[in-house]
């Protein structure tokens, strides 16, 4: 039961294969987070992609970080997605991967912060985007959070190894993820 995920795409399709892959990855991220979180997928006390995104969508009207125009766009996106939070996330994820990665702003501040935290770009993309003042604060915050996690994990791993434990490849991969 511990096998890698597999994605099947049609050989012949009317849509662009790259867009189809990005859309599928957005759905996958949402569903895997729901599966991992279990019944807490929507509970903001358990911080996760789905819980923070649901909180953002549910309470966008009261969110002071959103302008009136941004609130209207969220309302329209929610109506277009037939009140499906997953579909709103997938559309934002597509914009994140397609446009925001190239430096073109399509998302509001709140959605961007959630996606930076849970769906970060590769280091070279982040370095290019750091030139832009819109991204500097969120990437600085991400780098600080990651540095804190690296420090905590390194201390934990050192303590574990000192007690005679062995660090598995999965734990090393986890550490590398935060070092990126």
Can you say where each PLM-predicted feature lies in the sequence?
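Active-site-flanking segments in enzyme catalytic domains
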Residues: 1-179
């Amino acid at each position: 039961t511990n096998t890698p995920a597999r994605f099947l795409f049609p050989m012949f399709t009317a849509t662009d294969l790259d867009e189809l892959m990005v859309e599928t990855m957005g759905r996958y991220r949402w569903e895997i987070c729901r599966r991992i979180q279990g019944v807490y997928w929507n509970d903001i006390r358990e911080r996760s992609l789905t819980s923070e995104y649901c909180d953002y969508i549910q309470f966008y009207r009261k969110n002071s970080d959103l302008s009136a125009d941004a609130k209207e766009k969220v309302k329209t996106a929610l109506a277009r997605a037939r009140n499906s939070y997953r579909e709103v996330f997938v559309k934002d994820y597509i914009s994140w991967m397609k446009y925001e990665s190239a430096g073109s702003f399509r998302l509001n501040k709140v959605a961007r912060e959630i996606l930076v935290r849970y769906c970060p770009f590769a280091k070279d993309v982040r370095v290019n985007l750091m030139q832009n003042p819109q991204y500097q604060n969120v990437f600085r915050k991400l780098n600080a959070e990651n540095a804190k996690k690296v420090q905590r994990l390194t201390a934990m791993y050192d303590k574990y190894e000192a007690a005679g434990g062995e660090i598995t490849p999965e734990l090393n991969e986890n550490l590398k993820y935060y070092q990126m």
